[in-house]
């Protein structure tokens, strides 16, 4: 059994490329649909025929473990046929362009393209080309450069809303909640997508990080900026830490990983500054002892990291299903 969308909840997006212009109603549709698929995943038979005989192509031009496997499992749970593209063994090595690769997969019958690339805008370019071809292909951005990572932010949103109401997750639950995002904001596509979704949901978003990783222009997103961690954590409801890419140390953006943890790493001691019922998120992979202490990461009283991973499959099933309804998939 798959969700049935009533007329007020009809999905109107062919592609999911950015969360910048998502409405509260659209976010709530994703949350409600993900809840339905979470119920499917909790059954003995964890599969529905929703996308049976439909072709989902995973084009990951950048390495990934969690996101790629999560999308692949989501497509399998929907009974889709899956094409996994591997750039290392593809015609890209022979000079083929990315657009030509996408058009080749379209010609083979791909109806959904899940795309990750290190350059910002690649999924948008492919989506525009698919629209030009009139092929009814749905494109989902699985992370593009420093731009966005919509499905990660949506699974974070689902995880948070379920924290406050497991049976009816909705954006209104985050109204006025103080959510602190800590780390390398400058280079984080996860931070950007979360900023869009959390602000739309009505959360009070704060950003914390060293000045080299948190430029002042991020105030334009409607967030409060902090260049020291302790003031940001005061009475926080949620703390979301971001992975620190080790190459930032090579670029002299931070003195050392040890010093970063000393000033911006989350520990049980720092959680005392937050509300007693605070919870901690991280998109993964985690650098233990850098963004989070191992003790905090493994503490189920505070850490929602495993719940985020579990939520990811249901949310990505929801996105593929919803995009499919735009293209004629029947509930």
Swiss-Prot record:
Q: Name one GO cellular component term.
A: cytosol
Record's keyword annotation contains Mitochondrion: no
What molecular function does GO assign, one term?
amino acid binding
Q: What class of enzyme is it?
A: transferase
Task: Name the PROSITE patterns for this protein.
Answer: CARBAMOYLTRANSFERASE
* This protein's pathway: Pyrimidine metabolism; UMP biosynthesis via de novo pathway; (S)-dihydroorotate from bicarbonate: step 2/3
One biological process term in Gene Ontology = 'de novo' UMP biosynthetic process
Per its record, the protein catalyses: carbamoyl phosphate + L-aspartate = N-carbamoyl-L-aspartate + phosphate + H(+)
| Listed EC numbers | 2.1.3.2
Record's keyword terms, sorted: Pyrimidine biosynthesis, Transferase
The record's annotation in Gene3D superfamilies points to: Aspartate/ornithine carbamoyltransferase
Q: Supply the Pfam families for this chain.
A: OTCace (PF00185), OTCace_N (PF02729)
Q: Give TM regions.
A: none
Q: List the disulfide bonds.
A: none
Q: Which family does it belong to?
A: Belongs to the aspartate/ornithine carbamoyltransferase superfamily. ATCase family.
Assembly with partners or alone: Heterododecamer (2C3:3R2) of six catalytic PyrB chains organized as two trimers (C3), and six regulatory PyrI chains organized as three dimers (R2).
**Which NCBIfam families does the entry mention?**
asp_carb_tr (TIGR00670), PRK00856.1 (NF002032)
Q: What's the stated role of this polypeptide?
A: Catalyzes the condensation of carbamoyl phosphate and aspartate to form carbamoyl aspartate and inorganic phosphate, the committed step in the de novo pyrimidine nucleotide biosynthesis pathway.
This protein's name: Aspartate carbamoyltransferase catalytic subunit
